[in-house]
Amino acid sequence: MPLGLLAQQVWARDPNDVGKRARRKQLPISQKESQQWLHSLDAVCTARDCCPTTRLVSVGDREADVYDVLAAARPAGVALLLRAAWDRCVSGPERYIWATVEAQPVVERLLLHVPRRGPQAARDATLALRFCPVTRCPPRHRQREGLPTVTLWAVQVQEVDPPTDVTPIEGLLLTTVAVDTMAEAIERVEWYACRWGIEVWHRILKSGCRIEERQLASGERLQRGLTLYSVIAWRIFYATMLARAVPEMPCSVLLELDEWQALYCAIHPCPTPPEEPPSLDQAVRWIAQLGGFVGRRRRDQPGAETLWRGFQHFMDLTKMYRIMRPEPSIRPKPS
């Protein structure tokens, strides 16, 4: 469940650095974009102070496959999980990480339903699961620094006998959390699957809130706008996921009293809302309906763009409802 935004970073690339990849390799991480992952890890470590009994796992995509990130100091209770991007050197007879993992026996075969995507039909994919500990060696170009090796656990899922016309599913995860059993390996894969939530949030921010179309005049205004719309995008995402997880809960867990009352009166329409709030699923569908969602079939789910438009109208309705509604002492009783 997306509980909020822990940290956010904004930066602009220098056009003068284009085409200078070899030179960037010699720079310290503090002068590279890779430092963003260290900043994110710092934010997780800071959050640890607020919830000392909770294990926090910082999940990163392939861009986070950086030695400095994996070797960074972390307090107890803070862990890393990322997707490997490069076939790095490791200790052992196989010398490289992919060969080391693929030399391990398959411990389980998992069945994954792959939904339809564009012209590709939906299919059921069989994934082979492997895992093992690995010792990551420091980068070769930094041998003079005397950097230590890093002990990690690798978990790989690889599609078995994929169709010839599709890209096979394959991923190799690296984590600082020990993986000793098949159940723990599956759990690490499930952890990484949660990272898809940040992609959904970005899609809401870009396609729903259309942040890229906000032609703001300066970088400062752009950052302020991004801050505002980031919270709005989170609320849309949170409302959607909460409604799917607990659809029968009253919508008062998400909406204020005036908000759900304004929504109810606008949808039906009527001057007096009921005493009890509607369900969370119904309220989210009503908000999406304000944005043009039809939902002819019950299983249809509103998308980011309709929810964004719906929330805009919903906020206007709530504002007007607060202005125009009668005082509680003179409100008509429901018939």
Question: In which residue ranges do the predicted regions lie?
Answer:
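Single, function-defining residue in the core of a domain
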Residues: 1-335
